[in-house]
Amino acid sequence: MPTETILQLLENGKWHHPKEITEKTCLPSFKVETVTKFLAKYNFVKLDEAEQKVKIDPPTNRFLKTIRQLENEKNL
């Protein structure tokens, strides 16, 4: 799923340029743009359109890390 792939890349909390996201996820640039704009609209990521960069919103990042941790504990 493109959204999950992009969120996994953004989990480091740093700013990423769409071109970098496209290269690392092998997703088409139009899909990266569509997904990042959707995520920004609902405040899952911060989108700096002037600088053309995106990063995950800290509360979203904490939530995703907690979910992953719970999933890992369940699988143990």
Short names for language-model regions:
Residues 10-13:
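Short helix-capping/hinge SLiMs at alpha-helix to coil transitions
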Residues 21, 33, 50-51:
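Short loop/turn and capping residues at structural boundaries
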Residues 15-24:
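Short acidic, hydrophobic short linear motifs in intrinsically disordered regions
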Residues 40-51:
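A short, conserved structural fragment
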Residues 1-3, 17, 49-73:
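Short, cationic-aromatic polyanion-contact patches
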Residues 27-41:
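Short amphipathic alpha-helical interaction segments
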